[in-house]
Amino acid sequence: MKLPSVKDLNLVEKTVLFRADYDVPLGQDSRVVDVTRIEDSIPTLNYLFSQRAKVIGLAHLDRPGGKVVKGLSLKPVAEKLSLLLGKEVRLSAEVLGEKTKRAVKELKPKEILLLENLRFDAREMRNDKGFAKRLASLGEIYINNAFAVSHRQHVSIVGIPRYLPSAAGLDLVEEVETLTKVLQNPRRPVVVILGGVKYSKIEAARKMIGWADSILVGGKLVIYNGFPKLVKKEKVSGDLKRDGEDITEASIKEFEKIIRKAGTIIWSGPMGAFEKEEYNQGTKRIAQAVVKSRAYTVIGGGDTEAALTKFGLVDKIDYISSGGGAMLEFLAEGTLPGVEAIKKERQE
């Protein structure tokens, strides 16, 4: 899939709306615990600055439910981003209003203004047309670099591109190119490993049955109503211990056998409560089997990456996607709403 890239547009001294993925974990002191997602935005931002662009950063943090939550301000993100960039990152006092408009007008080339948490405004999640128009009016060009939320029908993902020339940031381009290769020309057999607690993965598994050679299911997914129907398919397997916190020894051995023969492995979600010593065997042994295999390995989702990091194996994975749900939806559908939005020409 060929995406319009940030490098395809004339950005010289343009005001650019830059959708980043800054949904990062904060500690009890409200400091950023993991800077990975912020670091991932730096190459695209540096390219924008090289074009003397005036940048308006768009991002969300957690799920404040459409209202202002002091502890979910993007202030810690702005501070960390400022350190990484080596320049001031101003934070707007609001998502959208007169103060924001004034701050945008004051922007000079190679400067950046980060708008406050978009999810403080309920219209973001509703994909409100009026809100999209008002945000779009702040800039001249829209760049999406937030793969992890590009499966969402939100204003900052699919609404703004209706009104502005749009393109993908460097991170989004890499994600889409990598996953497209995996989807269109994988080394077989393809083994998909799904775990965790999100029911949406059951639907993803259902859609991937025709593409994958084996689907291995663990975590809480096996107790959901949709799972028994999936198990009837010969490609799908999974079993949970009675305590509901890990997969059984029989499942571990079965999964290890399938993984050894894999040509491509896609993994999203742990096999159980890996944070607890007594429940980490399923996730740990599957992780060990994955990195020992000769397969091309792709993981997605914060818990999966955290588990592999805990077991000291994350560096042995071939590709780490920034999004679990977005990765699975892309592999199931071949695209994402946010990807389609920047491919389409402006509608209005």
Regions found by a protein language model. Name each.
Residues 1-348:
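Active-site loop-to-helix "anion-binding N-cap" substructures in soluble metabolic enzymes
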